[in-house]
């Protein structure tokens, strides 16, 4: 298996759902960390969802509070996500939150004879 560590970052400049990470084709990912920081000096909230390959949306964090000028680690355990699944983030207020996701991408090893 080919394993690669990646990170994805977004500055939430709107209140629209924003794609943070899409698992690549033929890959499983283990999300190790989702860090959210608030940089305006005002408390805010964030919503994080997982969309599966059938377009079903699952709430991971619904209106999660982030303290003023604070940084929060949202995961207490790794999160396994499958090929083509999507992590989306939505800020309650634009231009306050930054999000960094760290993951290990695992691709199946090619077998040759």
Annotate each PLM feature.
Residues 1-29, 33, 90-113:
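C-terminal interaction-tip segments
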Residues 19, 44, 58-62, 72, ...:
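Short beta-strand segments
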Residues 36-41, 92:
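Short solvent-exposed strand-capping/beta-turn motif centered on an Asx-Ser/Thr pair
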Residues 43, 82-84, 96:
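Extracellular Ig-like/FN3 beta-sandwich strand-entry sites
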Residues 46-48, 87-89:
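Hydrophobic beta-strand residues in large extracellular and virion-surface proteins
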Residues 47-51, 100-102:
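Beta-strand signatures of extracellular beta-sandwich domains
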Residues 51-86:
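Intrinsically disordered, low-complexity Pro/Gly/Ser/Thr-rich segments with frequent PxxP/GP/PP motifs
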């Amino acid at each position: 298996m080919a394993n690669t560590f990646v990170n994805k970052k977004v500055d939430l400049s709107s209140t629209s759902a924003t794609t943070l990470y899409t698992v690549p084709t033929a890959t499983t990912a283990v999300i190790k960390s989702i860090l959210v920081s608030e940089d305006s000096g005002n408390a805010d909230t964030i919503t994080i969802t997982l969309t599966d390959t059938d377009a079903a949306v699952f709430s991971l964090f619904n209106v999660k509070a982030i303290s003023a000028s604070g940084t929060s680690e949202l995961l207490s355990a790794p999160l396994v996500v499958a090929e083509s699944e999507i992590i989306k983030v939505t800020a309650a207020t634009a231009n306050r939150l930054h999000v960094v996701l760290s993951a290990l991408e695992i691709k199946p090893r090619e077998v040759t004879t």
